A protein has these predicted regions:
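Secondary-structure edge/capping motif, primarily at the C-terminal ends of alpha-helices
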Residues: 286-298, 321-328, 353-360
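Catalytic-core regions of glycoside hydrolase
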Residues: 1-262, 308, 315, 320, ...
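Amphipathic alpha-helical repeat scaffolds of TPR domains
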Residues: 338-353
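Flexible helix-coil transition and linker loops at the boundaries of alpha-helical arrays
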Residues: 272, 322-338
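Non-transmembrane, amphipathic alpha-helical segments
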Residues: 211, 299-309, 331-334, 338
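The N-terminal extracellular segments of secreted preproproteins, especially immediately downstream
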Residues: 70-75, 287, 298, 343-346
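Long, charge-rich alpha-helical interaction segments
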Residues: 243, 248-252, 263-309
Length: 411
């Protein structure tokens, strides 16, 4: 309270009887979308921007970020969240038409907006492009092979304002897509998060790259015409296979993943591919990405032992890579070996902390081992920070190590 001027407070969503920034963060704050002054201010801003930027062909028109943060006032309760969104979209379309602005408007289905509108419909769907953003999906599997069965519909979970949980299951996510496609048959694309948090869960990155490849191949069957990647920019450690697979498969969805893998690893590691593949396999021998995704039991003696063993093996792998560098004259290959050697050392520290967690050791012990990893990470950031997002590696590892294995987003 007090962070918002009183004369602006009426514009914010009312939650539990109060209107304020959600979690003290403007980005996470929804507005009172039934308020006509809010509607006009939002639409005026978009129109003004497009008049100033006639070069824009597609403009994204999103609501606030986060979830379970929509307005509970009496007027907003008259329509669903998605219906109020359609009201805004139709008003925006009308104003753009009046101004002879031809730009397409991208609307999103994300968190609460996954539930399709009930009472309202887009008046001119040709103005719009739909963006499917399955932020809570699992990346342990791909969409490949999933296809809508004509005539078969699964009921969506009941919408409960500000009391929602969101699915990790792929088919459940796709049911939301299909329900929205029943209401909107225009252009649509996938807005996905493969390279946002997942590089810090699938630490070797090879299986993740294959999921990316398969997801891109699946787009056509899902009625989606492309992909926008919401990701970190420094996604190149232990390698850049994930983003390479994404780009090449978007260019040609028929390309074989094994071919891409061999192309990339050969270009990056030259004659040392066999050794590198063996070292990357250590990660999968000693940790499963599903563990870091909270999809396995937190306390697991076998996984703890594997983490401890993996730490030793990764340190040996780092020694081997440094030895290979001694006679390597190719600068690209030398850099790739250097980055992988550092990454093995870093993950050896991480594995020791994860082993302590999997054994159920006291949080202080886990924290102590995390601190050693944290120190190693940031002591080397100036040298390796262009290739690895140190902030996100630190943040994600700390969250995983400190969590009680309860994902509040998903059912």
């Amino acid at each position: 309270p007090g962070s918002v001027p009183d004369y602006d407070r009426e514009y914010l969503a009312e939650i539990d009887g109060a209107r304020d920034f959600y979690m003290d963060t403007p980005l996470y704050s929804q507005l009172c979308y039934s308020n006509e002054k809010v509607q006009e201010k939002m639409i005026d801003s978009v129109v003004e921007y497009l008049l100033d930027h006639p070069e824009v062909d597609y403009l994204h028109f999103w609501l606030g970020d986060n979830y379970n943060n929509f307005c509970e006032c009496e007027k907003c309760a008259q329509l669903s969240v998605s219906d109020w969104y359609v009201v805004l979209l139709n008003k925006l379309d009308e104003r753009l038409t009046q101004k002879h602005i031809s730009a397409k408007i991208v609307f999103l289905i994300y968190f609460e907006l996954l539930w399709p509108p009930v009472q309202k419909q887009l008046k001119h769907p040709e103005r719009f492009v739909m963006m499917f953003a399955p932020i809570t999906r699992t990346y342990s599997k791909s969409f490949l092979g999933e296809k809508r069965v004509e005539g078969v519909k699964r009921a969506l979970p009941k919408f409960r304002l500000n009391r929602l949980r969101f699915p990790s299951d792929l088919r459940e996510n796709l049911e939301f897509l299909y329900a929205n496609q029943d209401r909107f048959s225009g252009d649509a694309f996938d807005f996905d998060y493969h390279l946002m948090w997942e590089p810090f869960k699938d630490l070797a990155g090879v299986k993740l790259a294959e999921v990316i490849h398969d997801d891109v191949r699946a787009l056509k069957d899902l009625g989606l015409n492309g992909m926008v990647s919401c990701q970190i920019q420094k996604a190149f450690m232990p390698h850049g296979l994930g983003i390479y697979a994404m780009g090449r498969t978007l260019e040609n969805s028929d390309v074989d993943f094994d071919r891409l893998r061999k192309e990339y690893l050969s270009a990056a590691f030259g004659d040392h591919v066999s050794s590198v593949v063996n070292i990357l396999q250590i990660f999968y021998d000693c940790h499963c990405p599903e563990y870091l995704r909270n999809e396995h039991s937190e306390i697991d003696a076998r996984q703890a032992e594997a983490f401890d063993n993996g730490a030793d093996r990764l340190r040996e792998g780092a020694k081997q890579l440094r030895f290979l560098r001694k006679e390597e004259s190719d600068k690209t290959v030398d850099l790739s070996l250097k980055l992988l050697a550092y990454y093995c050392e870093l993950c050896a520290h991480y594995f020791l902390a994860l082993g302590a967690k999997a054994r159920g050791e006291a949080r202080e012990k886990v924290r102590e081992k995390f601190s050693e990893m944290h120190k190693f990470l940031f002591e080397n950031e100036s040298e390796y920070g262009n290739y690895l997002d140190s902030f996100y590696f630190d943040l994600m590892s700390e969250q995983i190590l400190n969590s009680d294995w309860n994902n509040v987003l998903t059912a």
